[in-house]
Amino acid sequence: MPDRRHLLFVGDGSFQLTAQEVSTILRHDYKPVIFLINNGGYLIERCYLGKTSSFNDVANWAYADLPKVFRPDTTARSFVVKTVADLDKALSAPNDTLIFIEASMDPFDAPVAVIESGNNGADLDYGPRGPQHRSNMLLRPAT
């Protein structure tokens, strides 16, 4: 392991596919900072096709509890962040162990480039008559 601290940013949908790796991180006493973006589902898929499609939703786990689940005697610190003040508190915590930060986000909060990429991909795959053109399906950048 390099001497520098690792930062991991992962969405809740992706994390649910690989959550057990937190156990490996704890077993080897690695000390990354994990930012879990909890937006209730697969944001990239919502941008691509299906803003309101339920298949893009994932179950809401108690993510911040998982380090204790995988290793009950862990010294890892977990935080659920909903405000800037919460984030400041999490980032000010001693960093001598794994830090797990669950950041709650709006399900449709996406960078403009991601939204545009999703819209373009849907147009390429499905054309102008595709279901992505229904008004309730398309994500649009905030104005």
What are these regions (language model features)?
Residues M1-T143:
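Thiamine diphosphate
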